[in-house]
Regions:
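Alpha-helix/helix-capping structural signal
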Residues: 8-9, 43, 77, 119
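Phosphate- and divalent-cation-binding pockets in alpha/beta enzyme and binding domains
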Residues: 47, 57, 81, 123-124
């Protein structure tokens, strides 16, 4: 099983004061114990790279968590799957980053997507029964 983090879930890891920081940490630890990978679509990082301080903090987090977090670049196969996610949901390019999270999840038989935006992701995930969207509290 795979756990996919969207930008909000990565932001929760980044900021100790974030309301979902402990929740994301706990879910990653449970996943690690079960042998599940934690994956971040690299396109989601574009939503987080903002200014030198914040970008530096994000790079430090990714370096510190390099064994826990797998970055998934968009290759041609993933791009094709993302297009399929958008098409199946009747969505446009405004949902491109969210569609990447669902597509990365759909690459595995069973996956969980951690998100602060469950509405859009649930709509995109509807055609994929093995993908479960979990809202951060």
């Amino acid at each position: 099983m795979r756990t996919v983090l969207d930008a909000e879930a990565v932001q929760a890891l980044l900021a100790h004061s974030h309301r979902a920081h402990r929740e994301v940490r706990a879910r990653l630890e449970i996943g690690r114990r079960l042998g599940a990978s934690a994956v971040v679509p690299t396109v989601a990082l574009a939503e987080l790279y903002r200014g030198r301080d914040r970008s530096g903090a994000l790079d430090a987090l990714l370096a510190r968590e390099r064994r826990a977090l797998v970055l998934r670049d968009t290759d041609r196969a993933l791009a094709r799957l993302v297009g399929g996610v958008l098409q199946a949901a009747g969505a446009g390019s405004e949902d491109l980053v969210d569609a990447h999270a669902i597509a990365v999840a759909a690459e595995d038989d069973r996956a969980v997507v951690l998100t602060g935006d469950p509405g859009d992701l649930e709509r995109l995930a509807a055609p994929y029964p093995g993908v479960t969207v979990v809202a951060l509290s």
